[in-house]
């Protein structure tokens, strides 16, 4: 549904926001009642784009507006529950030899290993969102492996792999994406954009 709402051919003005922005908006609105101006600032979108985004969510009956601001409807809460069921730990990741930016953010996507091809799709999505790049790991037989070769993390980086596993606590066939950027915001948005590729 979120992908359809973000498509340019949807009814109404051509949106200048993405499926990722819609997902983030639902997460934000699900955590607090929020007004348009504050939501605009949180999303990093202009006032016009935020107004259109809110209109699309209203038309889809995913949110409603009260005196306290935007809040999720039952349908909106259902979508948020689906997102939470697919996404696991989200965390700032320390700079290391495997990271690709001064700031790094990781996210776990549950049970999505079979959707990973080469990892390039995730990297490209992260870059389009403003990150420098992204590194993707999948969990196979209890170990972190790196596509496309599915080879184990090099021995010299085993301590890093161990720290990642302790931080994200992945299960078999989970995916961990770590995006790096020139700011925490770009790193987080890159990781989320890469994760969305696996949920489309």
What residues fall within each predicted segment?
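Short alpha-helical segments that sit at the start of domains
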Residues: 1-23
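Short amphipathic alpha-helical interface segments
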Residues: 19-34
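A short acidic, leucine-rich amphipathic alpha-helix
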Residues: 38-43
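Short amphipathic alpha-helical interaction segments
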Residues: 44-58
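A short, conserved structural fragment
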Residues: 58-68
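Basic, amphipathic "hinge/linker" alpha-helix immediately C-terminal to the N-terminal HTH DNA-binding motif
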Residues: 68-81
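Long, charged amphipathic helices and adjacent flexible linkers at domain junctions
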Residues: 87-101
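Mid-protein regulatory/catalytic core that forms ligand/cofactor-binding pockets
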Residues: 98-198
């Amino acid at each position: 549904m979120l992908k359809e709402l973000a498509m340019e051919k949807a009814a109404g003005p051509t949106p200048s926001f993405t499926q990722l922005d819609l997902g983030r908006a639902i997460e934000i609105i699900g955590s607090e009642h929020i007004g348009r101006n504050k939501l605009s600032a949180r999303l990093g979108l202009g006032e016009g784009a935020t107004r259109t985004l809110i209109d699309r969510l209203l038309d889809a009956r995913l949110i409603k507006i009260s005196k306290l601001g935007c809040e999720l409807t039952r349908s909106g809460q259902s979508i948020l529950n689906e997102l939470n069921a697919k996404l696991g730990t989200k965390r700032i990741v320390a700079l290391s030899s495997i990271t690709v930016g001064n700031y790094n953010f990781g996210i776990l996507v549950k049970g999505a290993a079979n959707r990973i091809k080469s990892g390039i799709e995730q990297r490209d999505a992260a870059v389009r969102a403003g990150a420098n790049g992204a590194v993707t790991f999948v969990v196979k037989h209890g170990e972190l492996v790196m596509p496309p070769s599915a080879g184990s993390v090099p021995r010299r980086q085993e301590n890093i792999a161990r720290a990642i596993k302790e931080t994200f606590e992945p299960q078999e066939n989970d995916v961990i994406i770590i995006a790096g950027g020139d700011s925490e915001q770009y790193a987080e948005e890159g990781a989320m954009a890469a994760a969305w590729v696996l949920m489309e």
